[in-house]
Amino acid sequence: MLLTAMTLFCSCSNEPHPADPSAYKAQQELREKYLNLMYGEWQNEMPREDGQLKSVVNLKLNEDRTFTLVESTLTPGNNGEWTSIHEYTSEGTWSLRVVRDDNDELRPILYLKERQEGGTVGRMVDFLNVDNDVLHIDLYPFSELKRVE
């Protein structure tokens, strides 16, 4: 009876038992290395091929794990200023994760869980790395965003 009690006691721990230990370990390492660098406001802009339009993205990643993403299309005005002709704003929560791709390889992502009417939508954005100045992600058509000072 003592042996049964000891076995039950030892098998119950507060340590997580992930379904995929290697992905869990990679995710912990990813967060330790990059999480504190992620917080802040990031943006980039890109002229379209015809030069008459410009795509702009602004991503704000907050420490409470909320985000605001603004994707805009601008056109030049008569006075030389760019004017927004289309703007899409999304908000929700974000996290750094590691998932398995179709080839069973580990894939680091920035996961954006967007609040929408009637529910939420998850968006997996490939994550490469981040430093104090540049966030390298695959947020089409951008491959990097620069920190806003």
What are these regions (language model features)?
Residues 140-149:
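Short, low-complexity, Pro/Ser/Thr/Gly-rich segments in the mature regions of secreted, periplasmic
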Residues 49-53, 68-134, 140:
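Contiguous, well-ordered beta-strand patches that form the walls/edges
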Residues 1-2:
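Sec-dependent signal peptide recognition
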Residues 61-67:
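Structural signal for glycine-centered tight turns and loop->strand junctions in beta-sheet-rich domains
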Residues 8-11:
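C-terminal motif of bacterial Sec signal peptides marking the signal peptidase cleavage site
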Residues 13-24:
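Bacterial Sec signal peptide processing site at the extreme N-terminus
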Residues 23-43, 60:
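N-terminal helix-cap/turn-to-beta initiation motif at the start of protein domains
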